[in-house]
Every structure is written in C-alpha cells, then in structure tokens.
Swiss-Prot record:
GO cellular component: plasma membrane; proton-transporting ATP synthase complex
Signal sequence residues: none
Name of this chain's protein: ATP synthase subunit b 2
Sorted UniProt keywords: ATP synthesis, Cell inner membrane, Cell membrane, CF(0), Hydrogen ion transport, Ion transport, Membrane, Transmembrane, Transmembrane helix, Transport
Disulfide cross-links: none
One GO MF term attached to the UniProt entry: proton-transporting ATP synthase activity, rotational mechanism
Compartmental location: Cell inner membrane
Length: 156
C-alpha cells in the first residue's frame, strides 16, 4: 500500500465531510430525534395519567353508585314504613268507626226496646183494666183507673 497524495486528499475530504456533518447535519437530526423521544415520552405519560384518571373515575362512579343504591334502599324502606303506618292508622280508624257504629246501633236498639216495653206495659195495663171492668161489670172512675194503671206499670 502506497501512501500518496490521493490518499491524503481523500483523508482531508473525509475529515471535512465528517466535520461538516457534525457541525450542520448532525444537530438537526439529533434535535428531531430528541423532539420525537420527548413527544413519545409525553404521550406515554399522558396515557398513564389517562389510565389513572380513568381508574379514579371508575372507582368514584362505583362509590357513587353504591351510595345511590344505599340511599334508594333507605328511601324504599322509609316508604314501606310510612305505607305500613298509614295502613295501621286507617285500620285503627276503621275499627274505631266500626265500634262507634256498633255502639250507636246498640243504643238505638236499647232505646227502641225500652219504647216497645213501655208500649207493651201500657197495652197490658189497658187490657188488664178492660178485663177487670168486665169482671166487675162496672165502670171504674178515671182517677181509680189511673191509679191501677200506674201500679201495674210500676210492677211490670
């Protein structure tokens, strides 16, 4: 291998080419690569943040759903209790009304019975006086008849 001027010329041209590439070509390429690396890293970080936010949102939604179910169950339980209370109150009121109607009916029956007894006493007294008149074959004066009727009514 001969070292001649061509080899030195090629060596100088290569060194100039390497210097030119290092000075003018390499920095924009490295800047583009670094920028691309940064965009990829930012995208991955955003993706991880998004996944964490999604997990937090899902956990929050699950918790809110549980709370809503608990509240709904509480409202349903309160509604059932209130419904039972209303039914009990109405049942009690109906029983009380029934008792009042029955008591009123008994009072009316008792009053009617007393009126009927009084009418029967008067009729019995009148029949007794009529029978006594026939037996005695004479007319009793009004005062004596009234006395007899009152005594009979009192005895009955």
């Amino acid at each position: 291998m001969n070292i001649n001027a061509t080899l030195f010329g090629e060596l100088l041209a290569f060194i100039f080419f390497v210097w030119f590439c290092m000075k003018f070509v390499w920095p924009p390429i490295m800047g583009a690569i670094e920028e691309r690396q940064k965009k990829i890293a930012d995208g991955l970080a955003a993706s991880e943040r998004g996944e964490k936010d999604l997990e937090l949102a899902q956990a929050k939604a699950t918790e809110q759903l549980k709370e809503a179910k608990t509240q709904a169950a509480g409202i349903i339980e309160q509604a059932k209790k209130r419904g039972s209370q209303i039914v009990d109150e109405e049942t009690q009121r109906a029983h009380q009304e029934r008792e009042n109607i029955i008591a009123q009916g008994h009072a009316e029956i008792e009053a009617e019975r007393n009126r009927a007894k009084e009418d029967l006493r008067k009729q019995v007294a009148a029949l007794a006086v009529a029978g006594a008149e026939r037996i005695l074959e004479r007319q009793i004066d009004a005062a004596a008849q009234s006395d007899i009727v009152e005594k009979l009514v009192a005895e009955l």
